[in-house]
Amino acid sequence: MENEAKKPLELYIHIPFCVKKCDYCDFLSGPAGKERQREYFLALEREIAAVPDFSDREITTVFIGGGTPSVPDPSLVGEMLDQIRNKFFVAPDAEITIEANPGTLYKEKLQIYLEHGINRLSLGLQSPQNRELKILGRIHTWEEFQESFFMARDAGFSNINIDLMSAIPEQTYADWEKNLRTVAGLSPEHISAYSLIIEEGTPFGERKLKLPDEDTEYRMYENTAGILEEYGFHQYEISNYAKGGRECRHNKGYWQRIDYLGLGLGASSLLDHMRFSNTADMKEYIGNSAFPDKIRQNMESLTEADEMAEFMFLGLRMTEGVSMEAFAEYFGKNMENVYGEVLKKHLEIGMLEQKGDRIYLSRKGIHVSNGVMADFLL
């Protein structure tokens, strides 16, 4: 049917390049020369050409992540987006985000992004204190960040996210509060505030670091929402805060289990009850990207039990929680019949709360969210 509503599909595109790998980073990324970057975008072009056009779907969001997707020549990003618009039905109001690091942006680059439909910028600041940026091994300064932020505003970006990191080595509670107020004072539309996680195999994983103690980390997290509220932000997910209507639609799609297709090196997908990812081997990806079946790995067909568990533990990441009605509509089962004991236990001990149709994590529950969510695995 011509007027029938198309089912939503999100796109994630992985650009694995950066200027220098940060000391805490365990993402699939690294520096590369111009030739390797061009070679990669050609491989990406072949993958996009080879996947189905999903004519029954509407692309509601596109997220270009990395790495640092603002490192390559902007014309490569622009050409890729043109190909995507020619291949898929991209909704006129689609949210199109690119991640960028301070110091990798200039006016013409931002202009090219806007001309090709990018309407949301996610800036990886991490901290407005140069001392903390140095500890993290970041290559930009707070001054360079401000220059990039105001340049993006002048270019016409009206939807900007800023990434912040707490529990940085040697960081005090006062440092964190100052960081929040400094960044909120810039009035971005969205702030993502993550706690530093020390990953094995990274330079941080091998060092003896002076990290904030548990009580300090607890206070940092617990007070973030209240501080940001003073500046007009509301918390809508465990680590995300937005001004009215500026929640990240792409990430909300992940938590609401909207299908997404991952393109590029190591990119993950959720498609028609299947989860899979592309190879993380660059040589293999470049050689076989024209044959999507050859680069796909970790194919997992989700059972109904898997999907119900995902509905619960992904949905509970959002402050609005999960809807019992939506669960019944999707699975044809009553949530209380499936998870009655788990719900009863966590409602009684105050980890979950219920308001009308919705069940959500309490403030207390958010701090032990992984433990609560694990109980929904049948």
Whereabouts are the PLM-identified features?
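Short active-site neighborhood of thiol/selenol oxidoreductases, capturing the structured segment around
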Residues: L11-H14
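Short, amphipathic alpha-helical interaction segments positioned at domain boundaries
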Residues: K364-L378
